[in-house]
Design a protein with these regions (language model features):
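A short beta-strand-turn-helix
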Residues: 23-41, 70
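Thioredoxin-like thiol-disulfide oxidoreductase module
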Residues: 29-31, 64-134, 149
Length: 151
């Protein structure tokens, strides 16, 4: 009996936890989703070495109200601004030609898509309309209370 109750409780907690996470997509997935649901794209431009970026993940994007708001209003994309991902967007291929695999866990070259987004600092969040225009940029670490009104 105790095992059944514990199992049920664990299952419930697991379900609630996963329901409160931002459902990140690739840029390709977000563009495809946007064609169907007409929601803007929310892009979190981060780097692997950025302390405030990690705090944003841990403290802000994990907040149930923030996650719910982002999932409801946007097609969310998590983008490594110094990563090696190739992004096909609006008829153009964006790459990071100077990317160095040996530096993948530290500072690296800036991705071409980062320049397209006009990222000035990390972390940066960009909201993009259906025409591919960045309509709003949010720069720096924000607590849930600070970020929610901007969403």
């Amino acid at each position: 009996m105790k095992k059944s109750i514990l199992l049920a409780l664990f299952t419930l907690v697991s379900f609630v936890t996963t329901a409160q996470e931002v459902k990140w997509m690739t840029m390709k997935e977000a563009v495809a989703a946007q064609k169907k649901n007409k929601k803007p794209i929310f892009i979190d431009a981060y780097t692997v070495w950025c302390g405030p970026c990690k705090m944003l993940d841990k403290n802000t994007f994990s907040d149930p109200k923030v996650a719910e708001t982002i999932n409801k209003k946007y097609n969310p994309v998590k983008f490594n601004a110094e990563g090696n991902e190739e992004i096909q967007f609006d008829g153009k291929l964006y790459k990071n030609p100077a990317y160095q695999e040996a530096r993948k866990t530290s500072r690296n070259a800036v991705h071409e898509f980062t320049y397209f987004l006009k990222v000035q600092a990390y972390p940066s969040m960009a909201i993009m309309d259906s025409k591919g225009v960045v309509t709003n940029s949010i720069i720096g670490y924000h607590t849930p209370a600070q970020l929610l009104p901007k969403l």
